[in-house]
């Protein structure tokens, strides 16, 4: 759990005790535990000196910060990678060992001057507490051959149908590579694929297709999704050797008032559901930490007339934690789920009238001790969403009608899911980082539901 003695830290979005953080790394589930590693600069609040930090949790909401586990060396700073459980007992290690594939960023430090980025291996035999670096089979200790000066960000998973481990990697520009291995020692490249606007931090996973008309039941259909850092996703097929894109790229996140906040999402290895965490590019408040992790999301696909659309939802354990509270407020953070019963303009109460009220379809107010910290207003005609804090108002384009929405607000961080999870928006209000919510109000045309 985040430290309580730092008033500028969120309650439920993980941040380290101190320093800069970015990409989630090595997400793996084992023995009822979620391990969360992450890019960390323990020396300051700006990007530098990349190490792997480590946190652990059991409910996808509360995390224990366990410090740094993978330090820079002569091969470079420790850039992004992944983790898997050694289920097949390979590499002379026990089945319960955790295996980590990571990027050593050559020429990123004085010690690694003149070296390229290389993909390397580490392991843990104590449940992920201690990571031990291990040379790969190539002459210089690499796991796979370097193809470009800064190729990076390996993601590894087992593909049952073809009986091999798959490694995906960003190579350069919009190019990604796919490798296969049966023993995690010898890897064979099977595809170099170009993805429109794709850049770094790849992931490749299979998702169930959910019926949009039958209460969210699975249809029995499955599709593969290739994921890249900006939240661009590409739906297609994968046979264990090659990925074939079948529809145009889409983006999983909506543009906020000034930025698409989520970046470099990664899925957990191990759990039955496909669970993803992204880095939220939040600002430093109070001089202690920069950046935080999103609340995890469970992924599936919905198929409609436009094709396959990513569906995101907050995990059941997250919702249950809020449901067990008296009023849906947990450690100063809140969760609510609304349905828009009447998409018509409403007449606001006189004391909360604002400059846009005559055009508003609905509004939500987050309060602390009778003070409105944040007001959300949806404009009827333009489908803009306005965010008001005191006399400051920002807005962003929704691009669609929101028939229903879920929100989690946590000390200045707002995550919104809409339209059964096909809409996702995250916004940072750093000036509210020290503020806890104790009550929520809404316009009459919004109805809470579970």
Model regions and ranges:
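Beta-rich carbohydrate-recognition and catalytic domains
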Residues: 1-154, 158-201, 206-259, 278-325, ...
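A generic local secondary-structure boundary/capping motif
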Residues: 111, 265-266
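Beta-rich accessory regions
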Residues: 239-258, 266-450
